[in-house]
Amino acid sequence: QSAQFRELEYALGIKDRIELDWFSGIEGERLTQRHASATLWDAFVGVMHRQGAPVPAHVLNRDVRETVIENAELQAVIIDRYSDEGFAGLCETLTDLDEGLQEWRYRHVMMVRRTIGTKMGTGGSDGAAYLATTLFRPAFPDLWAIRTAF
């Protein structure tokens, strides 16, 4: 996996620490900084809070170095606000982004399988086998979890 793709994942909220060891030099420094920074999801949650939504304190104060995980309390807040057209549109845009990332991953896995088969990947991973484990790892799990509420 490229450093640029890792930066994108870190910016969205998918933060696997083990991958920091795969990069050195300027790439490693940039990734370490991005890993320690707030995410797009954190910004989204912060906007909700500033607009008066009762976002749980532990969600607002989460360790930004950790991957965003599902939170039932936050899901209830999101569902409650979904009747607001602008808010719902923003949620749908984030879901579109997340879906696009997952679709890109699938296409990437298939390209890798076609190109190198089961050989080791260029980033030091197990190649296509590793990539396949990332296919259904959403950046915004709460936006997927609430789908059953509609």
Residue ranges of model-derived segments:
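C-terminal accessory extensions/subdomains outside the catalytic/core fold
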Residues: 2-150
